[in-house]
């Protein structure tokens, strides 16, 4: 079990990557740690890479993960989930559950596309920026 949290200042983004076997409790603990880094720096971009996990998390584990995102993550946060092709079915479930909870999450098979997507401004962020410019 291991995970790495890499904050990248120029992108205002935190990269969270998992490797090996990861019990659900530790999986969530790593996400909370990454969220804390985002909160401290006032950033809203998170890229989660699970391609190096040795096993595919079960549907209930992924459901718990997505539910946790929905209840604990700021609505302005963008989360890109990078998965392997055999993880895609479960990633689709995570995306659907998170979006029902109004979390901006998308899954990707290509890490470069995930990074491009997460760096885009959301509609809400654009409106906030316009509002600040008018003041």
Language-model regions, residue ranges each:
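Amphipathic, Lys/Arg-enriched alpha-helical "gate/interface" segment within cytosolic domains
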Residues: 1-135
């Amino acid at each position: 079990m291991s995970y790495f949290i890499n904050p990248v200042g120029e992108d205002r983004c935190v990269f969270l990557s998992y490797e090996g076997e990861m019990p659900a409790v530790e999986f969530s603990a790593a996400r909370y740690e990454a969220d804390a880094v985002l909160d401290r720096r006032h950033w809203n971009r998170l890229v989660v890479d699970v391609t190096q996990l040795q096993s595919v998390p079960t549907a209930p584990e992924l459901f718990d993960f997505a539910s946790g995102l929905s209840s604990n993550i700021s609505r302005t946060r963008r989360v890109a989930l990078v998965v392997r092709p055999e993880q895609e079915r479960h990633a689709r479930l995570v995306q659907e559950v998170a979006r029902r909870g109004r979390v901006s999450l998308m899954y990707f098979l290509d890490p470069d596309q995930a990074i491009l997507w997460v760096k885009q401004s959301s509609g809400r962020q654009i409106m906030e920026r316009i509002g600040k410019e008018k003041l």
